[in-house]
Amino acid sequence: MGRQAGTDFGVIIAVKNLATAKSRLAPSLPAPQRERLVLGMLTHAIAVAFSAAGTVAVISPDPTAKAAASEAGARFIFDDTPEGHPDPLNNALRSAAAQLRASSPNLVVLQADLPVVTATEFAAALAAARGHARSFVADRHGTGTAALFSTDGDLNPLFGIDSAQRHRDSGAIELTGDWPGLRCDVDTPEDLAVARELGAALPL
């Protein structure tokens, strides 16, 4: 599958403030290495998204993430979610979806921390998602969500603890393809080890 696979899809990638990103890796990685890791994974996710989708947007409050997104050719949306918001990630995703919906009839939320996701996997997931109004790919643990797809305009992101079950309960169809790279998000030292086993060249 080539770039034509999903040119009517808009991809949303959300990135936290880099100062607080990937805090669970702090015991094994100091802050400068965590920042390099986050930016490297973001750049990889953008490249994979562009391989199969027509529009890629990064939403973040962080100026360094903005620079990385712009350099990679992605649209940047400033995340103006107020401090103390009870659901900041999903609020940011809803904001980005509202801005992309006019130009992209189909939407995808792709996690920013997927260092071994491949263009082939992403294109296959997009193709599978076309058969459903709303669908998702669970992470390798089966509890989180690596990607959320909408082909009817109603994204309804429910990321957070047990997001896979929350998306199932909300009616989203679980896509069950053999996509180990797409399912391998990195939050913990164990995740880093698995990503390396799958061939990730991590920028540490």
From Swiss-Prot:
InterPro entries per the UniProt record, alphabetical: CofC, Nucleotide-diphossugar_trans
Pathway in which this enzyme or protein is active: Cofactor biosynthesis; coenzyme F420 biosynthesis
Keyword set includes GTP-binding: yes
EC number of this enzyme: 2.7.7.105
Keyword vocabulary terms for this entry: GTP-binding, Nucleotide-binding, Nucleotidyltransferase, Transferase
Source organism, top-level taxon: Bacteria
GO molecular function: GTP binding; phospholactate guanylyltransferase activity
Catalytically driven reaction(s): phosphoenolpyruvate + GTP + H(+) = enolpyruvoyl-2-diphospho-5'-guanosine + diphosphate
Pfam families referenced in this protein's UniProt entry, alphabetically: CofC
Binding positions for phosphoenolpyruvate per the UniProt entry: 145, 160, 163
Positions in coiled-coil regions: none
GO BP terms in the entry: F420-0 metabolic process
Similarity field: Belongs to the CofC family.
Job description of the protein: Guanylyltransferase that catalyzes the activation of phosphoenolpyruvate (PEP) as enolpyruvoyl-2-diphospho-5'-guanosine, via the condensation of PEP with GTP. It is involved in the biosynthesis of coenzyme F420, a hydride carrier cofactor.
Name listed for the protein in its UniProt record: Phosphoenolpyruvate guanylyltransferase
Gene it is expressed from: fbiD
